[in-house]
C-alpha cells in the first residue's frame, strides 16, 4: 500500500499497522519472494514509513527469527525502529519477535536454531536499546516462557489465536465459508483470552485489552 491508500484506513477504524519484514538478508529475501510487489525489498522496507505518512497512529516491526542469521536480523530490526522513532517521535512503535516454527506440509523450510535463551537475550536487548517501544511475544512460544518474559520486558501478549486461513471469518460470522485452509504455523500457547486474563491477574498484573483512547 502507498501513503494515499493508508489515509483511508483511519476512517474505517484502523490506525495501527504491523509489517513483518521477515528477514533483512536481501539474498535470502529474494529466494522466498519470487513474484509480486512483496518481492521488491526496498518497497517492503519502507512500508512502515508510508503508513506513518498516511496518518496511521503507530507501526509494528518484526523479523522472523530463524530464516537467516538471527544476530543480523535482530540488530537490523532494532535499527529500523530506532531510525523511524527519531524521525516520527509522535508515533507509537512496537516490536514482535516470532521464531520460525515448523511449517505444516512443507519440509523445505527448516528453522535455524533460535533457542529460548537466545530469544530472551534478544528481547532484553530490545528493551534496553528501545525503552519506550511495545514488545509483543507470539503464541508460537509456550505459556511458561510467555509468563516469564512478561515479568521482564514484554508488554503485549496475544491470546485466543488461530492461524488457520479463514478461521476468524467462520468464527465471527458463524458461517461455513468453505475457505479455511491449513494452519500457517503451530501454536504453542493455546490459552483463551479469558484464561490468559486470569493467569495475568493471579501474577499480580493488570491486563488491558485496549491501551489507548481517542478523546
Predicted regions and their residues:
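Catalytic cores of alpha/beta
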Residues: 2-11, 57, 67-82, 142-152
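Short, hinge-like loop/turn segments at secondary-structure boundaries
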Residues: 14, 35-37, 78, 153-154, ...
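Generic structural signal for helix capping and beta-alpha/helix-loop junctions
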Residues: 26, 68, 166-167
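Aromatic/hydrophobic pocket-lining residues that form the small-molecule binding cavity
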Residues: 2, 41-44, 74-77, 119, ...
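Auxiliary Fe-S-binding modules of radical SAM enzymes
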Residues: 75, 86-215
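Conserved strand-turn element in the central/C-terminal portion of the radical SAM core barrel
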Residues: 1, 34-36, 47-73, 96-112, ...
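Core AdoMet radical
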Residues: 1-52, 57-61, 89-96
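Conserved, mostly hydrophobic/aromatic
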Residues: 19, 51, 81, 126, ...
